[in-house]
């Protein structure tokens, strides 16, 4: 007689003197990503934070406000989804772990230590792409990022 191979495995565990049958199926792990707009509150929080940090650090927003808008919106998305303003301009194998660690949370360690912002959100005055502004309006962010 031939043995049949099951596609589903079963494990038995003993719980308080009774046997429990637990069914385990082997499914590939996958991640489903969905595009969720950040809340207006988070965008406003990140906008105000960015303005305040630019003033405090003596840095300026990019001459192309589209760059500034996209980065602020990305920070707001991460604030909503991860609970922290993780740098939106980097690739992460595990965003949640990176957000917990804090190294790449805005302002990131390279920005705090050396005034090096990979996102071009905070630029030193001598940077060729630095504008003259340390402010940006919420309406400007909405307008630039409306179709993204």
UniProtKB/Swiss-Prot annotation:
Keywords: 4Fe-4S, Chloroplast, Disulfide bond, Iron, Iron-sulfur, Metal-binding, Oxidoreductase, Plastid, Redox-active center, Transit peptide. Residues 1-35 form a transit peptide. Disulfide bonds join 89-119. Its cofactor is [4Fe-4S] cluster. The record marks 118 as: Increases the nucleophilicity of the active site Cys. GO terms for molecular function: 4 iron, 4 sulfur cluster binding; electron transfer activity; ferredoxin-thioredoxin reductase activity; metal ion binding; oxidoreductase activity, acting on iron-sulfur proteins as donors. The active site is at 89 (nucleophile). Its main location: plastid. It is an enzyme of class 1 (oxidoreductase). The keyword Nucleotide-binding does not apply. It catalyses: [thioredoxin]-disulfide + 2 reduced [2Fe-2S]-[ferredoxin] + 2 H(+) = [thioredoxin]-dithiol + 2 oxidized [2Fe-2S]-[ferredoxin]. Its EC number is 1.8.7.2. GO terms for cellular component: chloroplast. [4Fe-4S] cluster binds at residues 87, 106, 108, 117. Pfam families: FeThRed_B (PF02943). Binds 1 [4Fe-4S] cluster. It is found in: Plastid, Chloroplast. Gene3D superfamilies: Ferredoxin thioredoxin reductase catalytic beta subunit (3.90.460.10). Catalytic subunit of the ferredoxin-thioredoxin reductase (FTR), which catalyzes the two-electron reduction of thioredoxins by the electrons provided by reduced ferredoxin. Belongs to the ferredoxin thioredoxin reductase beta subunit family. This is Ferredoxin-thioredoxin reductase catalytic chain, chloroplastic.
């Amino acid at each position: 007689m031939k043995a049949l191979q099951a596609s589903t495995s079963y494990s038995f565990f003993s719980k308080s003197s009774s046997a429990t049958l637990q069914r385990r199926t082997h499914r590939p792990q996958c991640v489903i990503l969905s595009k969720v707009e950040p809340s207006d509150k988070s965008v406003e929080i990140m906008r105000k934070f960015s303005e305040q940090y630019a003033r405090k650090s003596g840095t300026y927003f990019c001459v192309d406000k589209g760059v500034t808008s996209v980065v602020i919106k990305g920070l707001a998305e991460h604030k909503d989804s991860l609970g922290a303003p993780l740098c939106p301009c980097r690739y992460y194998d595990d965003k949640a772990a990176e957000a917990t660690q804090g190294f790449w949370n805005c302002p990131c360690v390279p920005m705090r230590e050396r005034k090096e912002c990979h996102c071009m959100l905070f630029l030193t005055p001598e940077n060729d792409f630095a504008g003259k502004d340390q402010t940006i309006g919420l309406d400007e962010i909405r307008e630039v990022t409306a179709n993204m």
